[in-house]
């Protein structure tokens, strides 16, 4: 047995809720530079936007983007928007991941045997609900990641300043910009990520290929990360472009997608695929492994407090 030993008592909804948010924050701290590189690659080629990289900066590949940013803007630029990112994960992941099992049980009416349909419904529900809660934090995170420190200066000086500036210049709706593509993206991501993780893990356990331990969690999380990236990349690129667009640049998320297709071709929808996969794959591994261990650790702590002797 590697890691914390599973307890006889299943984790409570509160443990899952807190564990998911904490695990997601840990994963973000480790993989945030890859996410920033992904955003820069995704917005490259846009004609305009409220914040954008310097005109001379051309990003090529994951490492090329990271090295260019470090050279032109300094190492700290890789963590632009980290505060908003952590705020997002505590509210976002807690809902979409922490409530997944509870919603799945609701759709299966308490049955232990969940069908793929009920898992997909649960993933869509918690993914969409999480967006409703955390959208402003996502907008601020993307804006921070998109802006360059070199050149014309930074538009947003702090996380609080970003919230205030967006609300003042673009109205309250500015903080909820891109909600539609984000709902679509996260319904898709949640279904692909959580359902795939569930299915791979169940298959490995049923076939007795692995035990419910770290290697099983690692393998399931990595597979889920790849499947999710392939499925969600197009809507993720549209979401990022639309969130970072200037007021009036696109009339809707659909208009943004159509403009991308006309001006840049279908390959534009997979811009930043490699950093997306590296980020999502590594993020999934860190998050799911940490989440599984946190659930066991928290339940062990609760059990020991209730029965100290």
Curated annotation (Swiss-Prot):
InterPro entries the record matches: Mit_carrier (IPR002067), Mito_Metabolite_Transporter (IPR050391), Mitochondrial_sb/sol_carrier (IPR018108), Mt_carrier_dom_sf (IPR023395)
GO CC, one annotated term: mitochondrial inner membrane
Record's bilayer topology term: Multi-pass membrane protein
Topological domain ranges for the Mitochondrial matrix compartment: 41-77, 146-173, 243-268
Transmembrane regions: 17-40, 78-103, 120-145, 174-199, 218-242, 269-294
Annotated Gene3D superfamilies: Mitochondrial carrier domain (1.50.40.10)
Main location: mitochondrion
Pfam (any one): Mito_carr
Solcar repeats: 11-106, 114-203, 212-297
Assembly notes: Homotetramer. Adopts an asymmetrical dimer of dimers functional form.
Function recorded in the entry: Antiporter that exports dicarboxylate intermediates of the Krebs cycle in exchange for phosphate plus a proton across the inner membrane of mitochondria, a process driven by mitochondrial motive force with an overall impact on glycolysis, glutaminolysis and glutathione-dependent redox balance. Continuous export of oxaloacetate and related four-carbon dicarboxylates from mitochondrial matrix into the cytosol negatively regulates the oxidation of acetyl-CoA substrates via the Krebs cycle, lowering the ATP/ADP ratio and reactive oxygen species (ROS) production.
Record-stated family: Belongs to the mitochondrial carrier (TC 2.A.29) family.
Protein name as catalogued: Dicarboxylate carrier SLC25A8
């Amino acid at each position: 047995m590697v890691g914390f030993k599973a307890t006889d008592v299943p984790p409570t909804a509160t443990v899952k809720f807190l564990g998911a948010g904490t695990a997601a924050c840990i994963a973000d701290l480790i993989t945030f530079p890859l996410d920033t590189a992904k955003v820069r690659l995704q917005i490259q080629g846009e004609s305009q936007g409220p914040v954008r990289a310097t005109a001379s900066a051309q990003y090529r590949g994951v490492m090329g983007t990271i090295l260019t940013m470090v050279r032109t803007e300094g190492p700290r630029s890789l963590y632009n928007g980290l505060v908003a990112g952590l705020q997002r994960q505590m509210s976002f992941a807690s809902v979409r991941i922490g409530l997944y099992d509870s919603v799945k049980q609701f759709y299966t009416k308490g049955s232990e045997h969940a069908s793929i349909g009920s898992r997909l419904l649960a993933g869509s529900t918690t993914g969409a609900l999480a967006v409703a809660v955390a959208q402003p934090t996502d907008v601020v995170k993307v804006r921070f990641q998109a802006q360059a420190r070199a050149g014309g200066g930074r538009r947003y000086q702090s996380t609080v300043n970003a919230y205030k500036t967006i609300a003042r210049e673009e109205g309250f709706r500015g903080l909820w910009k891109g909600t539609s593509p984000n709902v679509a993206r996260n319904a898709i991501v949640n279904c692909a990520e959580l359902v795939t993780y569930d299915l791979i893990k169940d298959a490995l356990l049923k076939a007795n290929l692995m035990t419910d331990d770290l290697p099983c969690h690692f393998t399931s999380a990595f597979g889920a990360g790849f499947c999710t990236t392939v499925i969600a990349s197009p809507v993720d690129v549209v979401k990022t472009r639309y969130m970072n667009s200037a007021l009036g640049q696109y009339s809707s998320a659909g208009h943004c997608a159509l403009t991308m297709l006309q001006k840049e071709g279908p390959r534009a929808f997979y811009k930043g695929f490699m950093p997306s996969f590296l980020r999502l794959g590594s993020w999934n591994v860190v998050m799911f492994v940490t989440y599984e261990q946190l659930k066991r650790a928290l339940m062990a702590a609760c059990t020991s407090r209730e029965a100290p002797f």
